[in-house]
């Protein structure tokens, strides 16, 4: 086991905070409509230019191990927020930095870190409740476009494209983003279906940038049982290999020898395959497999239909123009199924919806209709150079996630105003002791920070703007794009409630953990002897605990 170094108390927290600040300072310059770009070096190929907070955070690794631990903690804030809401990563980072900075002052003054954390948690819970009260649902295509525009750093064309895509495929439809071949953005809607199962092995990935497996013009094998014996699969694999096309296998499970053989053949380029588990469970799984079969023009290989794997031929396999398989989702684009059969299937499911007695069953049936009838919208991002397209794609992805979040939990005034308004709800909040009250004050100050940073990035004086916005009420705020005060909802500056809520909760969670840290253990440099660094129990000296 490698030797470890241990750093204690104030020394540890100070170093961790330095790491937090280095990462947060790099990320927060991207916040708001006038946020700046960050250039990321690549070990091969052109550098990447981005305004996406989580992309910047993921690139940062610091040489100082203790600073790096602090940076990684804030990186976790951005990653968690990205995973949960798809946007708001920069806001979450700014909030985390503010909570750590304000909290450190109180910890250094001798207040109890655990009570500070309890006060922070209490204030955040009250702030989230208030956010939900001021939130309202998105009702129009215009509002969806406005949310997308704000998330795309004020680019209206992106907002309009996403709103149009949602209009075409519905709120339950699937929208994907691709590189375009022209200077302008384009929107294509193709018939398709997405289900919540991903690849069974990461070795199937052939697009490392997106961490997905993409296959063009594949055959699709549908089976309702587990596949573990490769001999059962050999006849159909040989037929597919002769055709020169890839294969997607959707089965209850693919394991053991069968999965290992598919992976090896894939790596060697003998037969490009991807294996995923069938969606759903029990009877619902059978119904979903049948949906996929009808959409792709194939048949489910099942005992009930008298078909077996050993005797399966290409005629029983479905086909599609393209398949995208991620860690958690599979999208079938432009299946080769007959339009009349698909329409008949949709009608059949609609009858089941009318007859359904439980809300859960009705909801799941409606999802199936949306997937069969809605199709997949593909936004093709245009640009003059590959670097421009990649940067724009990041913003389209963020905007897409933001609109999904807005549909899910509603919207609040944007531009950092919603967080200023929730301060009024927690201003009178009291903890059980003075230290908890200090924790509440930390959150009160941190809630100003996103607005301060947006204004700073726009080149204005933050304190003046924050004071004026705080004097107002409701939707009154500062539009950093135009430099004008007014009703932000009317001027289309909106944020999804889910994004704002998730950013605040994740920032408080990780910042609270960092404030309550009193020792840090990390691997000692190879050329240094293991030591307990100054500041440990019993180590005298100014500024350290005794």
From Swiss-Prot:
Q: What is this protein called?
A: Chaperonin GroEL 1
Keywords attached to this entry: ATP-binding, Chaperone, Cytoplasm, Isomerase, Nucleotide-binding
InterPro entries this protein is in?
Answer: Chaperonin_Cpn60_CS, Cpn60/GroEL, Cpn60/GroEL/TCP-1, GroEL-like_apical_dom_sf, GROEL-like_equatorial_sf, TCP-1-like_intermed_sf
What GO cellular component term, any one, is given?
cytoplasm
Q: Where is this region: Disordered?
A: 527-546
Q: Is Chaperone a UniProt keyword of this protein?
A: yes
One BP annotation, GO: protein refolding
Species for this entry: Burkholderia lata (strain ATCC 17760 / DSM 23089 / LMG 22485 / NCIMB 9086 / R18194 / 383)
GO MF, one annotated term: ATP-dependent protein folding chaperone
Q: What is its EC number?
A: 5.6.1.7
Chain residues that bind ATP: 30-33, 51, 87-91, 415, 495
Q: Which reaction does it catalyse?
A: ATP + H2O + a folded polypeptide = ADP + phosphate + an unfolded polypeptide
Q: What does this protein do?
A: Together with its co-chaperonin GroES, plays an essential role in assisting protein folding. The GroEL-GroES system forms a nano-cage that allows encapsulation of the non-native substrate proteins and provides a physical environment optimized to promote and accelerate protein folding.
Q: Which SUPFAM superfamilies match?
A: GroEL apical domain-like, GroEL equatorial domain-like, GroEL-intermediate domain like
- Gly residues compositional bias: what residue ranges? 535-546
Instruction: Give the multimer and partner information.
Output: Forms a cylinder of 14 subunits composed of two heptameric rings stacked back-to-back. Interacts with the co-chaperonin GroES.
The answer, when asked if Chaperone is one of the entry's keywords, is yes
The record's subcellular location field reads: Cytoplasm
């Amino acid at each position: 086991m490698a030797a470890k170094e241990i750093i204690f108390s104030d020394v540890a927290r100070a170093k961790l905070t330095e790491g937090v600040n280095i990462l947060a300072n790099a990320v927060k310059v991207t916040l708001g409509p006038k946020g700046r770009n960050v250039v990321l070096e690549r070990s091969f190929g052109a550098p990447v230019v981005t305004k996406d907070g989580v992309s910047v955070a993921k690139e940062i690794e610091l040489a100082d191990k203790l600073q790096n631990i602090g940076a990684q903690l804030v990186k976790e804030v951005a990653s968690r927020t990205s995973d949960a809401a798809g946007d708001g990563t920069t806001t979450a980072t700014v909030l985390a930095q503010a909570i750590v900075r304000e909290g450190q002052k109180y910890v250094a003054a001798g207040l109890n870190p655990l009570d500070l954390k309890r006060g922070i948690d209490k204030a955040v819970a009250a702030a989230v409740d208030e956010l939900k009260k001021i939130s309202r649902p998105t009702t129009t295509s215009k509002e969806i476009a406005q949310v997308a525009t704000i998330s795309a750093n004020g680019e209206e064309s992106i907002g309009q494209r996403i709103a149009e895509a949602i209009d075409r495929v519905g709120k339950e439809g699937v929208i994907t983003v691709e590189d375009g071949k022209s200077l302008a953005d384009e929107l294509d809607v193709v018939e398709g279906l997405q289900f919540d199962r991903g690849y069974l092995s990461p070795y199937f990935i052939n697009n490392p940038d997106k961490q997905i497996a993409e296959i063009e013009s594949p055959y699709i094998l549908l089976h309702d049982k587990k596949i573990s014996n490769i001999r059962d699969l050999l006849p159909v694999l040989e037929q597919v290999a002769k055709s020169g096309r890839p294969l997607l296998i959707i089965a209850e499970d693919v394991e053991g020898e069968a999965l290992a053989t598919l992976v090896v053949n894939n790596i060697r380029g003998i037969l490009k395959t991807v294996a995923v588990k069938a969606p759903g469970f029990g009877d619902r799984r059978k119904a979903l497999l049948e949906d996929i079969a009808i959409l792709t023009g194939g048949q489910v290989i099942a005992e009930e239909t008298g078909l077996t794997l050993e005797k399966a031929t290409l005629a029983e396999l479905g086909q599609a123009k393209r398949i995208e398989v991620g860690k958690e989702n599979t999208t079938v684009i432009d299946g080769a199924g007959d339009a009349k059969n698909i329409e008949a299937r949709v009608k059949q499911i609609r009858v089941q919806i009318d007859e359904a007695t439980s809300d859960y069953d009705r909801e799941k049936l409606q999802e199936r209709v949306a997937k069969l009838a809605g199709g997949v919208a593909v936004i093709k991002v245009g640009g003059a150079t590959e670097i421009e397209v990649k940067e724009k794609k990041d913003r389209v992805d963020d905007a897409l996630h933001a609109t999904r979040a807005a549909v899910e939990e509603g919207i609040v005034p944007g531009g950092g105003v919603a967080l200023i308004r929730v301060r009024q709800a927690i201003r009178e909040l009291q903890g059980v002791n003075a230290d908890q009250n200090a924790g509440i004050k930390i959150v009160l100050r941190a809630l100003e920070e996103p607005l301060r940073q947006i204004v700073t990035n726009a080149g204005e004086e933050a304190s003046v703007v924050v004071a004026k916005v705080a004097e107002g009420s409701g939707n009154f705020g500062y539009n950093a794009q135009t430099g004008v005060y007014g009703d932000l909802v009317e001027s289309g500056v909106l944020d999804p409630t889910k994004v704002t809520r998730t950013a605040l909760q994740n920032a408080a969670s990780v910042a609270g953990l960092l404030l309550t840290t009193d020792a840090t253990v990390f691997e000692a440099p190879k050329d240094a002897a293991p030591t307990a660094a100054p500041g440990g129990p019993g180590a005298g000296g100014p500024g350290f605990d005794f």
